[in-house]
């Protein structure tokens, strides 16, 4: 049996188990990563897969960013600022439905400028505080926050790794995501999708009309964590404008810049807290409450995806898309969008987009057309496709991890009740808007 076929079988078994045994997702992913590493590294003769490849597959920038933000979130929660923000939200909206949608919109706005995972970690404590005050389940609000952050990540150059990949490949700057070559760019397609998905959320939560219970305003005990959270947002935005070094140690630091920022701010917060309290209790609490299961799950999935990439599965999918599209631009655009949605629901969209960008460029050259409509279609499909399943995007995995720590195990069916209508609405609107401006006009 060929390496290609075995890789597909292993990958299929992994994802079936991930869906059917949600409590053990981290161990399943870890086991799969070990199997892929040993098999490709020691047994398969036609693929070179070394320890360096395994280590290189793990995105330490993302893991450090998640870990650092998780720690800052612990400080943020202890300061009681999320409770105060929850009090403000409760005073501004009439019922639970409007409060949930408002939090999802807030997550989307923040995520347009900050990494999706960091956004979920920032907004989730507010949602949890609102739900605790109202004595309702936080499952639906957290899912809404996760999928909203994924949607808006494609809006700007700094919102998501896939946007950064496209910007670098197509030589697009921050403002090109708003207006490009005299036409409305991808930002507007995403924002129209965000408006329509807000209506979808209003419909999905139409029965949550119970009035909000108001209480006395919470008193914030420490404002330092709030400044740290704001610092994360500002510094992550500024870091996205740093020029990429040519190589060496500076390039390594550049590739880890978001993670380094979050970890440094966490250390600063812990030092300030220790100086204020003369104790190390908060450091112990941060270490204890870190979501190690989510970190292990993500690290393992990075290796699994690298495994099927090395086995040629992603390249084969790209070739298949080219064969199906032929010379019809609209058909090719349609195939790229919806195939990207389906593929990204199950595999990490970063290696997929990396693989497809040169493929799309070649297809456009063959068809003698500009590649931008295909670039934007690829970005929309690949970014939003991860929204469909609970393990399709890092933000979803993070949200599920937060809920698990709160005692809620979320099944795929429960997640997809929100994610599927949300994603279909966002994809269809983006698909039509992009084709209107870049395929017709």
Description of each model-found segment:
Residues 26, 61, 98, 139, ...:
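Residues that define the loop-to-transmembrane-helix transition and helix capping
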Residues 16-23, 106-115, 146-158, 338-352, ...:
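Transmembrane alpha-helix interface/packing and boundary motifs in multi-pass membrane proteins
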Residues 49-139, 294-367, 371:
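Membrane-embedded alpha-helical segments and adjacent helix-loop junctions characteristic
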Residues 85, 118-129, 142-143, 155-170, ...:
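Re-entrant/interfacial helical elements at transmembrane boundaries that shape
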Residues 135, 179-189, 300, 330-441:
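C-terminal transmembrane helix pair
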Residues 130-226, 370, 397-432:
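Membrane-core helix-loop-helix motifs of multi-pass transport proteins
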